[in-house]
């Protein structure tokens, strides 16, 4: 979707570029379908640095494991593993949708999206009814729903013999689920091994409040910043310094892996941009990165008067009062923090 949108605005895939890039050119590169970097070439040499906006496009969710489908007491489930920091108790008894891809051994990619259309089925993670939850209610919030209890209820109707049930098949409900997946997605059970399926709350974003002053939606961390960063990039024109917007994966689990910021996707892509200008050198790449200025765009917590004890009010952000700039993050003694220097903050505020 992002690629289609930016191509309408004149962006071209960097790998398709023939000839030398010049000021005003717009290019992009995609990493494994999960991260994207966009560049608008400025009038100044790239080695003088770029203005970079960065955001992440993954959100906390529940992932389906690689051998997930099982039956227990005539109920079919998908075995799961939660992704990122979640409050597990928030994910039970909600309508849930299944998104992702199935990649078959022949390389065929089948997209999966079940639970978002009005006539789609939805899924659920079950919970105890209040009448049986006496002991459960005594537990801490962190333990009231355990990670192993987040398996997704996906079916309960058994496959009948006249519908093709094998006489030796003991798990008729599981067999029926697989029949449906085969009919709709041409999927075999072993295809789960090379699938990436994600469980998220079902439903569209909605206006919140009688005055419609707020937006209620899944995934605002950090897609609200990714969306605005993308459109800021599309709106900018005639830049002096090269502009860059990078939207990446895997932030919620530490920015690891080939599509997270710990990989060298940005550095490699900048190297390709310099090379496409016909003047590549390692020194120019290092100078381009050293002289660049970046805003890491992520969400912040707005002051909530119902939970005032969780905030330091004098330094807190307040809802609906404009942009939030964090000089530093981290915990306790600024552990794991990136502490921006005062000169850079002053430059940002002047802008």
List where the protein language model places each region.
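N-terminal hydrophobic/helix-forming segments and targeting peptides
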Residues: 1-351
């Amino acid at each position: 979707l992002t690629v289609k949108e930016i191509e309408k605005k004149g962006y071209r895939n960097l790998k398709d570029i023939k000839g030398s890039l010049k000021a005003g050119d717009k290019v992009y590169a995609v990493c494994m379908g999960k991260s994207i970097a966009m560049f608008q070439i400025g009038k100044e040499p790239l080695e003088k640095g770029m203005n970079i906006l960065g955001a992440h496009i993954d959100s906390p969710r529940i992932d389906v494991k690689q051998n997930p489908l099982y039956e227990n007491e005539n109920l079919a489930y998908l075995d799961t593993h939660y992704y990122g920091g979640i409050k597990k108790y928030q994910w039970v008894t909600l309508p849930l949708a299944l998104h992702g891809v199935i990649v078959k051994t022949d390389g065929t990619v089948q997209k999966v999206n079940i639970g978002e259309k009005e006539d789609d089925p939805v899924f659920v993670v079950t919970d105890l009814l209040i009448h049986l939850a006496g002991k459960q209610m005594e537990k801490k919030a962190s333990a009231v729903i355990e990670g192993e209890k987040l398996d997704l209820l996906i079916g309960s109707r058994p496959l009948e013999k006249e519908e093709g049930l094998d006489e030796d098949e003991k798990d008729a409900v599981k067999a029926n689920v697989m029949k449906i997946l085969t009919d709709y997605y041409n999927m075999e059970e072993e295809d789960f091994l090379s699938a990436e399926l994600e469980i998220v709350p079902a439903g569209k974003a909605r206006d919140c409040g009688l005055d419609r002053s707020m937006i209620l939606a899944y995934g605002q961390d950090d897609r609200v910043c990714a969306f605005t960063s993308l459109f800021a990039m599309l709106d900018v024109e005639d830049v002096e310094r090269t502009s860059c917007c990078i939207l990446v994966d895997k932030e919620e689990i530490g920015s690891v892996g080939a599509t997270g910021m710990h990989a060298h996707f940005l550095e490699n892509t900048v190297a390709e941009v310099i090379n496409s200008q016909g003047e590549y050198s390692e020194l120019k790449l290092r100078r381009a990165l050293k002289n660049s200025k970046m805003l890491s765009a992520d969400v912040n917590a707005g002051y909530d008067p119902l939970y005032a004890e969780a905030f330091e009010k004098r330094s807190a952000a307040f809802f609906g009062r404009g942009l939030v700039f964090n000089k530093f993050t981290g915990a306790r003694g600024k552990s794991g923090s990136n502490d921006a220097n005062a000169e850079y903050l002053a430059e940002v505020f002047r802008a």
